[in-house]
């Protein structure tokens, strides 16, 4: 007969009693109780209806939760401007402007500049000449007003220390600069006003690599003359990406004459929203136009060496319209994984509805105590009894 260490049985009993008191050895199973509670029942059905409408109407249909998406397409943009204009100014006499003159840069890109007005200062050479009176701190009465070597922020050159006559009414500081200095008198009307009748051709191609799908905004046609005569119209010619400049500016809410005088910036947005479940038939560009800012100009010069061996230049201050083309896009196609995720999310929300209704029934309802006792009860198996002989 083996002897057990003292206290082993009592320790095991104590551990078992503790586990029972903590409920560690209890097993819980669900109990379904049919309750005749109208307001909780109505709340449950309304919440379930809301979940079903959200999942089917919004998540699946409106947001296309059954589709896999590609929101980073490869983008290609090619632009071409067509038109000819003639200007008649004293400094340049009669001059013809074509695409090579009024478009910067000459290669079509998604950002380009169309010249609509200009200010020319011909035959400049480096030397001494009076500063323009419109420049701050340029006007003077004596040489003391023109410190030698001083160069202002808006000055055209470096002061020589002399105060000289600019014309019959103004005296200004003499400067070392490209002479004569540029005038600040902008033409009252845009010199290239014919630019409003120029046409802009935008060819945009988007490629969604995830779906091996590509689409262009230009009509696929064998007629080589089609794009020479068509103009864009959202209803009659949606696949003719040829825009008249005047119409394009008008679609931004601006006026071409005002914008052409001192320049500005126009944004052209092209957005692709493609549903590839329809084999690409529901994939067309949407255009929008914004006037981004008013006032845009920059300077450029043509240099040459005169017969006397002196370097000369003609300075052009160009005003015009800067066009910024921004292309965005997304494409969706049916896939099992996003569909399963959307449906699974809806099922989880339906489970949350049951949980919320239980809270209403067991904690908020006036008969919460009764429902609590009915739903939760403790079940013990009857103890077996033995009769002694």
UniProtKB/Swiss-Prot annotation:
Topological category with respect to the lipid bilayer: Multi-pass membrane protein
Residues with PTM Phosphotyrosine: 66
InterPro entries linked: P2X6_purnocptor (IPR003049), P2X_extracellular_dom_sf (IPR027309), P2X_purnocptor (IPR001429), P2X_RECEPTOR_CS (IPR053792)
GO molecular function: ATP binding; extracellularly ATP-gated monoatomic cation channel activity; protein-containing complex binding; purinergic nucleotide receptor activity
This protein's GO CC annotations: cell junction; cytoplasm; dendritic spine; endoplasmic reticulum membrane; glutamatergic synapse; neuronal cell body; nuclear inner membrane; nucleus
Transmembrane segments: 42-62, 336-356
Tree of life domain: Eukaryota
Subcellular location: Cell membrane; Endoplasmic reticulum; Nucleus; Nucleus inner membrane
Family statement: Belongs to the P2X receptor family.
Impact reported for residue 21 to K: Promotes the formation of homotrimers
Name of the molecule in the record: P2X purinoceptor 6
Annotated function: Acts as a modulatory subunit rather than a functional channel. Unlike other P2XRs members, P2RX6 does not seem to form functional homotrimers. P2RX6 requires the presence of P2RX4 or P2RX2 to become functional at the cell surface. P2RX6 can be translocated to the nucleus and functions as a nuclear regulator of post-transcriptional modifications in neurons.
Entry PTM: N-glycosylated. N-linked glycosylation can affect trafficking to the membrane and function.
Major location (coarse): membrane
BP term (GO), one: response to ATP
Glycosylated residue positions: 167, 197, 212
Disulfide bridge map: 129-179, 140-163, 146-173, 230-240, 274-283
């Amino acid at each position: 007969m083996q002897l057990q260490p003292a206290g082993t049985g009592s320790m095991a009993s104590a551990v078992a009693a503790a586990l029972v008191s903590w409920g560690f050895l209890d097993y819980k199973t669900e109990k379904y109780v049919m309750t005749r509670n109208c307001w909780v029942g109505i709340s449950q059905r309304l919440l379930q209806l809301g979940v079903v409408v959200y999942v089917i109407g919004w998540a699946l249909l409106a947001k296309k939760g059954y589709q896999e998406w590609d929101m980073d397409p490869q983008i290609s943009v090619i632009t071409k401007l067509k038109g000819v204009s003639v200007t008649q100014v004293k400094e340049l006499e009669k001059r013809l402007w074509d695409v090579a003159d009024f478009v910067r840069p000459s290669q079509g890109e998604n950002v380009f500049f169309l010249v609509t007005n200009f200010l020319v200062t011909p035959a400049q050479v480096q030397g001494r000449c009076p500063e323009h009176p419109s420049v701050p701190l340029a006007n003077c009465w004596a040489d003391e007003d023109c410190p030698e070597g001083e160069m202002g922020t808006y000055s055209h050159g470096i002061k020589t220390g002399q105060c000289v006559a600019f014309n019959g009414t103004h005296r200004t500081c003499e400067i070392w600069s490209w002479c004569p200095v540029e005038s600040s008198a902008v033409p009252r009307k845009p010199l290239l006003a014919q630019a409003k009748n120029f046409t802009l051709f935008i060819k945009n191609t988007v490629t969604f690599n995830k779906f091996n799908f590509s689409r262009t905004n230009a009509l696929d046609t064998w007629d080589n003359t089609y794009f020479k005569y068509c103009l864009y119209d959202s209803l009659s010619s949606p696949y003719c990406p040829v825009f008249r400049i005047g119409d394009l500016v008008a679609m931004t809410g601006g006026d071409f004459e005002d914008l052409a005088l001192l320049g500005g910036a126009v944004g052209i947005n092209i957005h692709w929203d493609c549903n590839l479940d329809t084999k690409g038939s529901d994939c067309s560009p949407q255009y929008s136009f914004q006037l981004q800012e008013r006032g845009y100009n920059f300077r450029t010069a043509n240099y040459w060496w005169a017969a006397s061996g002196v370097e000369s230049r003609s300075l052009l201050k160009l005003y015009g319209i800067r066009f910024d083309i921004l292309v965005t896009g997304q494409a969706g196609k049916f896939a099992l994984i996003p569909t399963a995720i959307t449906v699974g999310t809806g099922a989880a929300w339906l489970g949350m509805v049951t949980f919320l209704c239980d809270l209403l029934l067991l904690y908020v309802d006036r008969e919460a105590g009764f429902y609590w006792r009915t739903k939760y009860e403790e079940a013990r198996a009857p103890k077996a009894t033995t009769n002694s002989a």
